[in-house]
Swiss-Prot record:
GO terms for cellular component: membrane. The chain crosses the membrane at residues 53-70. Pfam families: UPF0547. It is found in: Membrane. Keywords: Membrane, Transmembrane, Transmembrane helix. It is a single-pass membrane protein. This is Uncharacterized protein HI_1126. It comes from Haemophilus influenzae (strain ATCC 51907 / DSM 11121 / KW20 / Rd). The lineage of its organism: Bacteria, Pseudomonadati, Pseudomonadota, Gammaproteobacteria, Pasteurellales.
Amino acid sequence: MSLTRCPECRKKISENAENCPNCGFSFKQKDLEMYKQRLEARRLHNEEVNRKSTKLHIIWFCIFAIFIAVTSWMVN
């Protein structure tokens, strides 16, 4: 009897279990497909958030660089 981890709660459970005894996650094929779809949707959402965050960091860096350049030009 080998053990595997529940994808929902990460506890070790039997490979033959139909449901996780800890969180109740179902290992039926239909439920696994739904879980994979939700996981993919979450991954795509996180990817979009990261892309927007990167753009925001670049914009703030440019504003800061312009501010430093203008300030140093005014001092000299």
